[in-house]
């Protein structure tokens, strides 16, 4: 098996959508509001998007007419977040997504970071309170007006970079036809994202020795709504991502290096947590190339979220999902086992 650093560099603004990006109004209210819509992209692709991209790049037949020949190489079906034991052929495991610049790696700053810190400075002053769910920890170091840290942490020294220095926005105006008995045109604004200051996306991929990577280790991919162009490069490299993150964490913190799909009562197993969530609905590519929308909407715990736990065994039972971890989901890092 070989490990590759996969680098994704957007060549144009991109759009990664989810359930909350479409702020559509009901048809009966459209006339009162000027038929206005606002659609906002996510900053980062989901791990399932990365898995889908890797499967497409590595599949030997891209016309969807040879599913039996493709299946041994990339697996017989798309990634399913609630499945238990899928195989993706030569793709053995993906790491969580991160961003890179000039050889430096950056990950979402842990959400227990004191606001406006130039380096990752975690909360350290906690007090215990009694709740209906048992003893919990609270801190006065969180300032509600400043909110949760919205930055990325450099793994070499813990310095933080505000997200606005990494991600830019570009708003485009278009129109869409609506049906309410008349053929009217409705305006909408679509907010695309682009990477600034020479940042790009990256992740590691463990591939079987039989995997055939693109010639010269370079190719292109079209990702997101609108199929924005990304350049993709493969470089054989050891994966030290988790060990680099661990060095920066306090001893009691469990940090979500990736988005996490967990059972609903996971927060009840924590003494302290700072979390954000994002919606997830799968779009599944069928063997004939047709794309279908999963009817189930899931909630993911967002990368950067942190937990303090008292019972690791029970916590792991709710968060350790091997099939998710193959695609790079559910990577929770701590120094507990050091």
Which positions does each model-derived feature cover?
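Conserved active-site/ligand-binding neighborhood in enzyme cores
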Residues: 1-338
